[in-house]
Amino acid sequence: MSLISKPGKYLRMYAGMLMRRDPGLIVFGAWLGERFADNSKELFLEAQAREGIRAVWVAKEQAVIDEINSLGFEAYLWGSPEARSIQQRAGYAVISNGISDLEHTYLGGAVILDLWHGVPLKKICYDDRYEKNWDSPKQKIRDFLINIPLGKEYYVATSQTFVPIYQSCFRKNPDHILCLGQPRNDLFFRERPEPYYPGKRVIL
Protein backbone atom coordinates (compact mmCIF):
# COMPACT_ATOMS: atom_id res chain seq x y z
CA MET A 1 0.00 0.00 0.00
CA SER A 2 1.43 3.38 -0.99
CA LEU A 3 2.01 6.23 1.42
CA ILE A 4 -0.67 8.18 -0.46
CA SER A 5 -3.34 5.51 -0.05
CA LYS A 6 -2.69 4.90 3.65
CA PRO A 7 -3.97 8.32 4.80
CA GLY A 8 -7.01 7.84 2.58
CA LYS A 9 -7.70 4.48 4.20
CA TYR A 10 -7.64 5.94 7.69
CA LEU A 11 -9.72 8.94 6.65
CA ARG A 12 -12.42 6.60 5.31
CA MET A 13 -12.38 4.65 8.58
CA TYR A 14 -12.87 7.80 10.61
CA ALA A 15 -15.51 9.13 8.21
CA GLY A 16 -17.44 5.91 8.80
CA MET A 17 -17.86 6.92 12.42
CA LEU A 18 -19.96 9.88 11.28
CA MET A 19 -22.33 7.79 9.18
CA ARG A 20 -25.65 6.50 10.43
CA ARG A 21 -25.49 2.73 10.74
CA ASP A 22 -28.45 0.39 10.53
CA PRO A 23 -28.64 -2.02 13.51
CA GLY A 24 -30.73 -4.41 11.43
CA LEU A 25 -28.07 -4.70 8.72
CA ILE A 26 -25.28 -7.21 9.36
CA VAL A 27 -22.38 -7.82 6.99
CA PHE A 28 -20.50 -11.13 7.10
CA GLY A 29 -17.14 -12.33 5.86
CA ALA A 30 -14.61 -15.11 6.48
CA TRP A 31 -11.12 -16.28 5.62
CA LEU A 32 -9.86 -12.98 4.21
CA GLY A 33 -12.90 -12.75 1.99
CA GLU A 34 -12.07 -15.91 0.08
CA ARG A 35 -14.51 -18.50 1.46
CA PHE A 36 -18.11 -19.04 2.53
CA ALA A 37 -17.24 -21.05 5.61
CA ASP A 38 -16.69 -21.42 9.32
CA ASN A 39 -18.48 -19.70 12.18
CA SER A 40 -19.39 -16.70 10.04
CA LYS A 41 -21.23 -18.96 7.62
CA GLU A 42 -23.23 -20.70 10.35
CA LEU A 43 -24.32 -17.44 11.98
CA PHE A 44 -25.13 -16.01 8.54
CA LEU A 45 -27.44 -18.95 7.80
CA GLU A 46 -29.07 -18.62 11.22
CA ALA A 47 -29.63 -14.90 10.66
CA GLN A 48 -31.62 -15.60 7.51
CA ALA A 49 -34.41 -17.06 9.63
CA ARG A 50 -34.62 -14.03 11.92
CA GLU A 51 -37.13 -11.28 11.22
CA GLY A 52 -35.84 -7.75 11.11
CA ILE A 53 -32.32 -8.77 10.12
CA ARG A 54 -30.77 -8.22 6.72
CA ALA A 55 -27.71 -10.45 6.54
CA VAL A 56 -25.31 -9.85 3.65
CA TRP A 57 -22.10 -11.65 2.72
CA VAL A 58 -19.09 -9.97 1.08
CA ALA A 59 -16.43 -12.06 -0.68
CA LYS A 60 -13.59 -11.69 -3.14
CA GLU A 61 -14.45 -14.70 -5.29
CA GLN A 62 -17.33 -14.65 -7.77
CA ALA A 63 -17.80 -18.39 -7.20
CA VAL A 64 -18.53 -17.69 -3.53
CA ILE A 65 -21.04 -14.99 -4.46
CA ASP A 66 -22.74 -17.36 -6.90
CA GLU A 67 -22.93 -20.10 -4.26
CA ILE A 68 -24.64 -17.81 -1.75
CA ASN A 69 -26.96 -16.31 -4.35
CA SER A 70 -27.98 -19.83 -5.42
CA LEU A 71 -29.20 -20.40 -1.85
CA GLY A 72 -31.43 -17.37 -2.22
CA PHE A 73 -29.32 -15.12 -0.02
CA GLU A 74 -27.72 -11.74 -0.56
CA ALA A 75 -24.01 -11.45 -1.35
CA TYR A 76 -21.82 -8.92 -3.12
CA LEU A 77 -18.36 -8.92 -4.61
CA TRP A 78 -15.53 -7.36 -2.64
CA GLY A 79 -14.77 -3.84 -3.89
CA SER A 80 -18.07 -3.39 -5.70
CA PRO A 81 -20.19 -0.29 -5.02
CA GLU A 82 -22.89 -2.52 -3.49
CA ALA A 83 -20.45 -4.23 -1.11
CA ARG A 84 -18.93 -0.97 0.04
CA SER A 85 -22.32 0.63 0.55
CA ILE A 86 -23.41 -2.31 2.71
CA GLN A 87 -20.24 -2.15 4.80
CA GLN A 88 -20.57 1.61 5.27
CA ARG A 89 -24.14 1.26 6.56
CA ALA A 90 -24.04 -2.03 8.49
CA GLY A 91 -24.51 -1.72 12.23
CA TYR A 92 -22.69 -5.00 12.78
CA ALA A 93 -19.89 -6.89 11.06
CA VAL A 94 -19.27 -10.60 11.68
CA ILE A 95 -15.91 -12.19 10.93
CA SER A 96 -14.01 -15.39 11.75
CA ASN A 97 -10.33 -14.64 11.17
CA GLY A 98 -9.78 -10.93 11.56
CA ILE A 99 -10.79 -7.52 10.28
CA SER A 100 -9.38 -8.36 6.84
CA ASP A 101 -12.26 -10.82 6.35
CA LEU A 102 -14.07 -7.67 5.17
CA GLU A 103 -13.03 -4.31 3.77
CA HIS A 104 -12.43 -2.87 7.21
CA THR A 105 -11.70 0.52 5.68
CA TYR A 106 -15.49 0.91 5.51
CA LEU A 107 -16.32 -0.42 8.98
CA GLY A 108 -15.50 2.63 11.08
CA GLY A 109 -18.03 2.88 13.90
CA ALA A 110 -19.57 -0.55 13.32
CA VAL A 111 -19.79 -3.18 16.06
CA ILE A 112 -17.45 -5.98 14.99
CA LEU A 113 -18.00 -9.52 16.25
CA ASP A 114 -15.04 -11.81 15.73
CA LEU A 115 -16.28 -15.36 16.19
CA TRP A 116 -12.77 -16.71 15.64
CA HIS A 117 -12.16 -20.11 14.05
CA GLY A 118 -10.89 -22.33 16.84
CA VAL A 119 -9.38 -22.26 20.31
CA PRO A 120 -5.93 -20.82 21.10
CA LEU A 121 -3.78 -23.93 21.38
CA LYS A 122 -0.78 -21.96 20.14
CA LYS A 123 0.55 -18.43 20.55
CA ILE A 124 -1.37 -16.07 18.28
CA CYS A 125 -1.53 -12.37 17.48
CA TYR A 126 0.05 -10.19 20.18
CA ASP A 127 1.31 -13.24 22.06
CA ASP A 128 3.24 -14.48 19.02
CA ARG A 129 6.47 -12.53 19.32
CA TYR A 130 7.92 -14.24 16.23
CA GLU A 131 5.27 -12.89 13.84
CA LYS A 132 6.33 -9.24 14.15
CA ASN A 133 7.44 -6.67 16.68
CA TRP A 134 4.05 -5.76 18.11
CA ASP A 135 5.55 -3.10 20.36
CA SER A 136 7.51 -1.21 17.73
CA PRO A 137 6.69 2.52 17.45
CA LYS A 138 5.26 1.99 13.96
CA GLN A 139 2.97 -0.82 15.11
CA LYS A 140 1.82 1.13 18.16
CA ILE A 141 0.88 4.12 15.98
CA ARG A 142 -0.99 1.84 13.60
CA ASP A 143 -2.87 0.17 16.46
CA PHE A 144 -3.75 3.53 17.99
CA LEU A 145 -5.12 4.89 14.71
CA ILE A 146 -7.19 1.78 13.98
CA ASN A 147 -8.54 1.19 17.48
CA ILE A 148 -10.48 4.44 17.45
CA PRO A 149 -12.76 3.72 14.45
CA LEU A 150 -12.64 -0.07 14.91
CA GLY A 151 -12.60 -0.12 18.69
CA LYS A 152 -16.05 -1.69 19.06
CA GLU A 153 -14.66 -5.14 18.34
CA TYR A 154 -15.67 -8.16 20.42
CA TYR A 155 -14.24 -11.68 20.47
CA VAL A 156 -16.11 -14.89 21.24
CA ALA A 157 -14.44 -17.34 23.63
CA THR A 158 -15.78 -20.85 24.11
CA SER A 159 -15.26 -20.96 27.89
CA GLN A 160 -14.01 -18.93 30.83
CA THR A 161 -10.72 -20.83 30.55
CA PHE A 162 -9.91 -18.99 27.35
CA VAL A 163 -11.06 -15.52 28.39
CA PRO A 164 -7.70 -14.43 29.91
CA ILE A 165 -5.87 -15.94 26.93
CA TYR A 166 -8.02 -13.91 24.53
CA GLN A 167 -7.47 -10.80 26.61
CA SER A 168 -3.74 -11.25 26.21
CA CYS A 169 -3.47 -12.30 22.57
CA PHE A 170 -5.94 -9.68 21.31
CA ARG A 171 -5.11 -7.04 23.94
CA LYS A 172 -8.74 -6.44 24.76
CA ASN A 173 -10.47 -5.55 28.01
CA PRO A 174 -12.56 -8.29 29.68
CA ASP A 175 -15.82 -6.67 28.56
CA HIS A 176 -14.77 -7.20 24.94
CA ILE A 177 -14.46 -10.97 25.36
CA LEU A 178 -17.83 -12.72 25.12
CA CYS A 179 -17.93 -16.18 26.65
CA LEU A 180 -20.41 -17.89 24.34
CA GLY A 181 -19.92 -20.72 21.88
CA GLN A 182 -19.00 -21.24 18.27
CA PRO A 183 -21.99 -21.21 15.89
CA ARG A 184 -20.56 -24.08 13.86
CA ASN A 185 -20.92 -26.32 16.95
CA ASP A 186 -24.60 -25.54 17.53
CA LEU A 187 -25.48 -28.38 15.17
CA PHE A 188 -24.54 -30.90 17.85
CA PHE A 189 -26.85 -29.40 20.47
CA ARG A 190 -30.10 -29.20 18.52
CA GLU A 191 -32.78 -31.63 19.58
CA ARG A 192 -33.84 -32.17 16.00
CA PRO A 193 -30.97 -31.02 13.83
CA GLU A 194 -31.84 -30.21 10.28
CA PRO A 195 -29.91 -32.08 7.59
CA TYR A 196 -26.58 -30.30 7.43
CA TYR A 197 -25.24 -32.35 4.58
CA PRO A 198 -28.24 -33.84 2.73
CA GLY A 199 -27.98 -37.60 2.46
CA LYS A 200 -25.20 -37.84 5.04
CA ARG A 201 -25.06 -38.35 8.78
CA VAL A 202 -22.89 -36.21 11.03
CA ILE A 203 -21.04 -38.46 13.50
CA LEU A 204 -18.22 -36.15 14.68
What are these regions (language model features)?
Residues 1-82:
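N-terminal pre-catalytic "stem/leader" segment of glycosyltransferase-like enzymes
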